[in-house]
Structure formats: structure tokens, C-alpha cells
């Protein structure tokens, strides 16, 4: 089947890499399994716990990708018995067969749906993997690597060198861009160039970790991870001195000092070793630097090694949130609304209403005290804990609020002012991208071969000399010939002498 990043099935299966999408900025990667390898002791088998509930993997298997999965109620009481298998067994239990017990433990229980909580089951893509991968180093996010791959002219069948694999975000994106088939051991009828990613990493543990991820994701045949110091040893595959050239068309350097590695990215290395670049095509390069001083040194070195079309770009990616904003005293209880006077007139009307209600409340208290004859007696409280005067005043306030709010035929989703704001949390970082192009090397042999394939035309000859003439052109030439003949005849006729008058 190949890698799930390149071609996936319609439904999830046992052993697949799945991404559990909880919300826009939270995704959990997991391998779908029935049995719990970590022995957490759940009766339902392998369970993934999130802030939105528990999800046994038995509910995630054989589901269409993109499905909404409801959380389940798991048997947490069985977790206390998870270490029973490691304890010593009694002598009476040694003679009893354990196959039935093992089968009972290996078969997960049937989960029950919980009252709330859900997630979405998604198949892996480079964009989702970037949002959910474990961060080992600085991550190249989707807005950056999409623009980088576009400027590097990466296409199916290209070979790209990546120096500084890090967390593997750019690796997964680039392998999808260059993929045009898997290499096969059988000789093909028509040989074609397959896309490949040659990734180099200086840190040994990170190189081993990215190598394991590439193997788990089924990308071994398309990505070759090498642990090497590219500053000193270059970019050849295998042995640094006598290795094989990757014949790269594109280069991405995510290094602290990319200018130190440019001495190996030339057409003819001074050491006499084979060049890692493709001799039959121009090579595109991009360096990823967080400081402007690094950019200056990189550009200076690129000019020394004959790189052309040098430019620097800074990618600033912002998501714009568009929504309706409701403000006013009549928006109390509306989700996301601002209960505040939207104008001076509304604020003044509210103050006058409050003053009027206070005046009515005081007058009612005085009137009630005069009727009873004792102003110090407290009015009787009702079931709600308030006096009759307070309840009457509250009713007047609610009635006044209802009358001030003018009825509207506009639906609730269309009320308010349409506004847009930039997202508060930007998942990006400051980075400067330097792009350059190294043209193809052109020799005298190449010039002679092209001259033989496309010979130059003779000097003074017409480019349409060998083409047949059309009817219009023949008529035009015949007419021009007649005009020339008439002009020549008029020149040959001598002038007649003038007759004298007698």
C-alpha cells in the first residue's frame, strides 16, 4: 500500500497511523492497536485519554476517515489489576491451562458511549503532522515550507537535499512534493528518474529518531537520512570522500551557519570529488536563517561561488478571524456579545430609566409606610426573598426594558457589526529565507553539440526561403512586376518636339 502520507485507504485499519483532531490547534498522533503494549490495564484494550474523554482504539478502527468519534466510558477499575501478570503464581495455578485467561485478557471489552466528548479521525498529511509532531528542534511550519518548495521549483521526480532534518516537518512535505513512484527491484521498461529526499542531520539522537519515524511512516524508499557534519564532509551519499552524488536539483539549508556548507555545493569541488549537484539542470537553493547577520554572510558567500538571482524573503502568515460583534444593553445573555452601551443616547436612556425606577421605588416605600403608620416596619418578604415593593419595581424595570428594545425582523446570526481581527496566537517564528540559482555549467562541447543540432542560418538569407509561396504572395509579386514594367516603358519612350505656330 505504501506510505499513508502519499496514498491512504478509505477506512482506518489496524496498525495505521491516525491523527486525532480535538480542536483547531490540538491534534494527537497515534498508532491504532487493539492490545495495550504499555499495559495500562484498561479492559477495553488500548485507550487514548484526552481532555474531551477517553477513546478506545476499538472504536477508531474500521471507520471512514473524517468521522466524528464519540468518547467512551472505560473501565478504570481494571487498572489496579494491570500488574497481576508480573506477580508469582501459586502452585495450584501452575497445572491449570492459561490459554483461556490469555484470550480473555487479549480480547478487549465492548466500550459504552459517554454522555459528552468527541473527536475527528483524520488520515496523516504533512500539514497535520506539522501541527502534531513532537518538537525536537525549531519547526518549519506550513506557510514557510509551502513557499520554499514553490520557489525551489520542486516537482515530481526532483531530488532535494535537506541539511538539518530536526523534527522532520520539512522532510514529510518535501517527500510528497517529489513523489512520482516507488523504486522497484525489477528493471523497468522505460527508465525514469524517481523523486528522492536526501536528509542530513548533525545530531546523532535526532538523526536516529527521524530515521525511525521515516521507517514507521513507510518512506524508507524515498528518504535517505544521513548522520553527518555537512560543514566538513559535504553532501555525498555513503562515504564523504568517495560516495555517490545525489544529483540534487534543489537544496534547503536549515543550519546555524549555512555559508560554511556552500563550499561543497559547487559544480567542480576543489578536492576533485564528485559534485552533489545535477550537472544537467540549474540548481535552486534556500537557506533558513533567524538573524539578519546570518543572511548577510550567506549572501556574500553565494556571490563568491557564482550563485545568481539572490533574494531574501520574510514570510508573515496571519489568520484573519471574521465574525459579527454585537454591542448593546439589549444583548444580555447573547454568547460573545458585549453588554455595554453602544451609543451616548443608549447610555443616557439607561441612566434615566434607572433614576426613574429608583424614584418609583422610594415613592412606593413612603406610600406603604404612610399606610401602615410606621415607617420603620420592614415590608413582608415573598417566597423569592424580596418584598412586594422590590418585586413590583423589578417588574417595572423588566417591562421598561422590553418596551425599549425595538423588535427586529433581522435574524440573530445577521445582527451586529461585521469585524475581522488577526488571530491572537501565531504559530510561527521570525525567519529570513534566502533564495539563489546556480546555472547549468556550459562547456565548449555543449556549445558544439547544440550548433550541430540547430545549425545557424546563412547570412543574408531569408528565414522563409525554402517555404512555398501562397496565392496572395504570387499575385502581389505579379502586380509589382507589372508596375515596374510600365514604369520602365514610360522612361524608354522619347519626348515629342513641340510644333511651332505658322
Swiss-Prot record:
InterPro entries: SAM-dependent_MTases_sf, TRM61_C, tRNA_MeTrfase_Gcd14
Gene Ontology BP annotations: tRNA methylation
UniProt keyword Methyltransferase present: yes
List of residues binding S-adenosyl-L-methionine: 167-169, 201, 206, 229-230, 254
Keyword Transferase: yes
GO molecular function terms listed in the Swiss-Prot or TrEMBL record: tRNA (adenine(58)-N1)-methyltransferase activity
Any one Pfam family match given in the protein's UniProt record, by short name: GCD14
Record GO cellular component, one term: tRNA (m1A) methyltransferase complex
Keyword annotations of the record: Methyltransferase, Nucleus, S-adenosyl-L-methionine, Transferase, tRNA processing
Subcellular location: Nucleus
Record-annotated disulphide pairs: none
Reaction(s) this enzyme catalyzes, per UniProt: adenosine(58) in tRNA + S-adenosyl-L-methionine = N(1)-methyladenosine(58) in tRNA + S-adenosyl-L-homocysteine + H(+)
Bias (Low complexity): 403-412
Biased composition (Basic residues): 79-89
UniProt family annotation: Belongs to the class I-like SAM-binding methyltransferase superfamily. TRM61 family.
Protein name (Swiss-Prot/TrEMBL): tRNA (adenine(58)-N(1))-methyltransferase catalytic subunit trm61
Source organism of the structure: Aspergillus fumigatus (strain ATCC MYA-4609 / CBS 101355 / FGSC A1100 / Af293)
Organism phylogeny: Eukaryota, Fungi, Dikarya, Ascomycota, Pezizomycotina
Gene from which the chain derives: trm61
